[in-house]
UniProtKB/Swiss-Prot annotation:
Catalyzes the NADPH-dependent rearrangement and reduction of 1-deoxy-D-xylulose-5-phosphate (DXP) to 2-C-methyl-D-erythritol 4-phosphate (MEP). This is 1-deoxy-D-xylulose 5-phosphate reductoisomerase. PANTHER family: 1-DEOXY-D-XYLULOSE 5-PHOSPHATE REDUCTOISOMERASE (PTHR30525), 1-DEOXY-D-XYLULOSE 5-PHOSPHATE REDUCTOISOMERASE, CHLOROPLASTIC (PTHR30525:SF0). The keyword Manganese applies. The gene is dxr.
């Protein structure tokens, strides 16, 4: 029986993780759950799964949930998240809290010697140097939950890193892959939230529409698989059946394929190094006989190009880019700026940032706060 803690249990990844836990109830026990503020769902989850620890980041919401669950101890704030992340009974911690909020709990879990299923790509983007150093020191398994990185992880199993020529991340291309510049001027929030193949939370869905999500995944792959930026390519694959590929020095390639559903990589992380019967029918090749590939347009989707620039520059620029992007996405969702302005504003902000080396968690948090402040007060410029 594997004991798991889920940070972000009320989000898309968290809910899917609990679905797998239901499916594999003879193998998986949920011992801790944590969320930002959705206490209605957290209450229902706690009653179903009976975890030892319940944590809510929002202090007022934690107090309210405690009143609803008098027989339970509800922990609050960042301290509560850290307690859930380092809980002694947990074998595996699923890090699925969106944004930089998940960075400290992820580090805490690794420090406690826990294996980590990482769905929070921002943690590696902002703190990759610190996290990977800790992973090596603690000798834990860092298991990627993103479908692309899970695919690469599986393709590299048993392979020598020196034989890797290229890592190829696939992208659906998002909902605006074929849109003209004129059409992109009028993108609505509803249109950007309508992803063609994946069901995700709002922030990740908007990032997928700008290809920033793919840019963050490029940086994540750099840290996870110890390759150079030049060895990481992105290709648009609208069907999202091939989740990523590895090309080796002898010219052969390995790809991981499945229906586009996050249940598959989540279950792999929960059962690793074993596999277990899944929730899906055998793959239908006739139904999925058309697989297409295109080159991404980095001029139209400038966020992808910006992510490559941040990775090559290094230092605090990836952290700054990630935090500023989070705020710009929030502003778009609130109707404060246009879809095209996300990339334009981000480029302007990144050009103004003086990158320094990442030497501590304090540096990361300070740069994160600076980026958020500057992105929140940045003045909009014309997209034309």
């Amino acid at each position: 029986m594997k004991h798991i803690a889920i940070l972000g249990s009320t989000g898309s990844i968290g809910k899917n993780t609990l679905q797998v836990a239901r499916h594999l109830k003879e193998r998986i026990k949920v011992v801790a759950i944590a969320a930002r503020e959705n206490i209605d769902l957290l209450e229902a989850q706690s009653k179903e799964f009976c975890p030892d620890i319940i944590a809510v980041f929002n202090n007022a919401k934690a107090y309210e949930l405690q009143k609803r669950l008098p027989g339970k101890t509800v922990l609050a704030g960042m301290e509560g998240l850290l307690a859930a992340a380092s809980y002694s009974e947990a074998d595996l911690v699923i890090s699925a809290m969106t944004g930089t909020m998940g960075l400290q709990p992820t580090i805490e879990a690794i420090k406690a010697g826990k294996d980590v299923g990482l769905a929070n790509k921002e943690a590696l983007v902002s703190g990759g140097a610190i996290i990977m150093k800790l992973v090596k020191e603690k000798n834990i398994n860092l298991l990627p939950i993103d479908s692309e990185h899970s695919a690469i992880f599986q393709c590299l199993n048993g392979e020598a890193l020196k034989s890797v020529q290229r890592i190829i991340l696939t992208s659906s291309g998002g909902p605006f892959r074929t849109w003209t510049q004129e059409q992109l001027e009028t993108v609505t929030v509803e249109q950007a939230l309508n992803h063609p193949t994946w069901s995700m939370g709002p922030k990740v869905t908007i990032d997928s529409s700008t290809l920033m999500n793919k840019g963050l995944e490029v940086i994540e792959a750099f840290w996870l698989f110890d390759v150079s930026p030049e060895q990481i390519d992105v290709i648009v694959h609208p069907q999202s059946i091939i989740h990523s590929l590895v090309e080796f020095c002898d010219g052969s390639m390995l790809a991981q394929m499945s229906e586009p559903n996050m249940i598959v990589p989540i279950q792999y992380s929960l059962t690793y190094p074993d596999r277990a019967p899944g929730l899906f029918k055998p793959f239908d090749f006739m139904k999925n006989s058309k697989l297409e590939f295109f080159e991404p347009n980095k001029k139209t989707f400038r966020c992808l190009a910006l992510a490559y620039e941040a990775l090559k520059c290094g230092g605090t620029l990836p952290c700054y880019m990630n935090a500023a992007n989070e705020v710009l996405v929030e502003r778009f969702l609130k109707g404060e700026l246009s879809w095209k302005n996300i990339g334009i504003q981000l480029e302007k902000l990144m050009d103004q940032h003086a990158s320094i080396s990442v030497d501590s968690l304090e540096t990361i948090l300070a740069v994160d706060a600076l980026a958020r402040e500057e992105a929140a007060r940045s003045k909009l410029i014309s997209t034309k």
